Structures are given as C-alpha cells and as structure tokens.
Amino acid sequence: SGNSYGEICFNTGMTGYQEIFTDPSYHGQLMVTTNSHIGNYGILNQEAQSQKVNISGLICKNFSYEFSRPGASSLYEYLKANQIIAISDIDTRAVVNYIRENGAMNAVISTQIKSIDKIEKELKDFPKMEGLELASKVSTKKSYLIGNPDSKYKVAVIDLGIKKNILNNLINKGFYIQVYPYDTEFSEIQKWSPHGYFISNG
C-alpha cells in the first residue's frame, strides 16, 4: 500500500519479468506488462539483473500469488520486501495503446489518494524523467574485477546502469573486466591499461 510515482512504460515480453524489474534501465519507472500472467513461475535470485528492483511500480493484468518452479520464491513476497507497489486486473493492452498514442508521461499507483484533483496536482509537481541525472542512482559505487585474470585482454566497463547479462556475455568472450563507477576519471581508468572500453547502456 502507498503511493508510487514514475514515468509509465511498457514491456511486451512473454517471460523474463524478474529480469525486467531488476534492469537498471527501468529505474524509477512504472512498468506495464502486456503478458496476461505475471508471477506464475516465481523468482530466482540468480536471474536478477542487478542488486535491487529498479521499477517504481508494476501494472499488470493477472497477478499470480501461486508459482510452480522448483527453487523459486514468491513474486508477491519479493515485491513486498523491496517495497514495490503493484496493481492488477488492469486492461494493460488498452494502457499500452494509450501510451503509444500519447507518448511518455508520468503516472501514479495509489492506495491512499482518493481525490482525482489531488492526484493530478501531485503528478504535475512530479519531475519528468527527461533530463534527469539517473546514472548516479544505478551505477556501482566502487570499481570491481570479474572474469579470468589470466585473460589476454582486459576491458574497462563504465557502468551507467549495466545489466548482469551484459557482463556475463563479456566474460564468456574471455575478457578480464574491471567495472568502474559512472563518474570515474579517464586517467584513473588508463592506469589499469585496458585493451578496450565498454560504455554500458542505462
């Protein structure tokens, strides 16, 4: 329960909701999922794309409290632990069509505000995502090394909100990687003498 604000966006994936929710690219956004069922295969920690849930709220058609995958845990408990508000029984395809026709906009999920006028006022006061500096909220705070230290090639990764799968793909290519915070000076990165540089999405 509570209020959750953010830019409303959507994802049409049939699976992978945990990866979507933990993707730093979606930081602070309200996620609309067009897949009919969300939560039916639970949550596995190893499938998270970052250390936290990045969406600010979930809007879905059917939310499943039951799940059927060995070793998984409840999406409901996962969202509750991360203080993420979700709303279900929504015609998400109609919402997606509205977003497509009207463009990016802020929205709110609320269990507390009963006045439409108050909701409209608070939405008007909520900052638009365009132009916001968000890299500092999703980037690593300290540099770290991953991969094979005996690799022939070293790659410096600038973290603007990188997903775990991108790092895994670089590691699978055989690179030794050092991940740097978004605001690291180039001269500091050069001290490691990397063979290549990778600037993440975010």
PLM regions: where:
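Glycine-rich beta-strand-to-loop/alpha-helix junction loops that act as flexible
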Residues: 199-202
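RNA-binding accessory domains that recognize and position tRNA/RNA substrates
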Residues: 1-187, 191-192
